[in-house]
Amino acid sequence: GYSPDEMEALFCSAEFENMLTGKLDDKYYYFFKKQETNSAWVQLKFDLDSAVFSPYLSLNIVTPYQMDFTFLELFSKSDYISKNNFDSLFIPFRCVATDVTHGKELVLDSGSLKDAIRASMTFPIYFNPIRINGNLMYDGGIFNNFPSDVLCRDFDVDYIIGVSVAKPQEEPTEDNLITTLTNMIVEKEQDKLFCKEGI
């Protein structure tokens, strides 16, 4: 239950900027063994003994460590109080993720709040997927980018106000991997309300 002012302060903070850029706050460095800097997206590994060629393509542009630590700090208290039941939060909560393992939409209503929120905003290529209950999860917008159906089904709502913050998708081009993948995997924007009352 963060107030609008608290949320605005978080979104305007250096910590939030670090989440989006992957820059790790100095206070977290002792959690990791420092590795040699490598900005490559693609690595080619050769095993000379067996002459095996195994290409490796990185699944993320931005490292998620800062986001994971920040979410741990922000949501651990709520996890503890709610006993991992999102209906027991001050405001009951749902979020939608994409279960990559089974190729389907998954509505998260329990478990780790930080993991659920992380999954629901993990866009392919930008962040690497998160594993929940053994399955890889990405942003739920791949299957359902306006989940009013979930809200109508799980909650007794009187009225829904839905806001689309999506921008029109760029046309895919031959030399832009991001726009090509975005057009392939993200469901076209839809704003259908499944309840009787709403805008």
PLM features: what roles do these ranges have?
Residues 2-199:
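Patatin-like phospholipase
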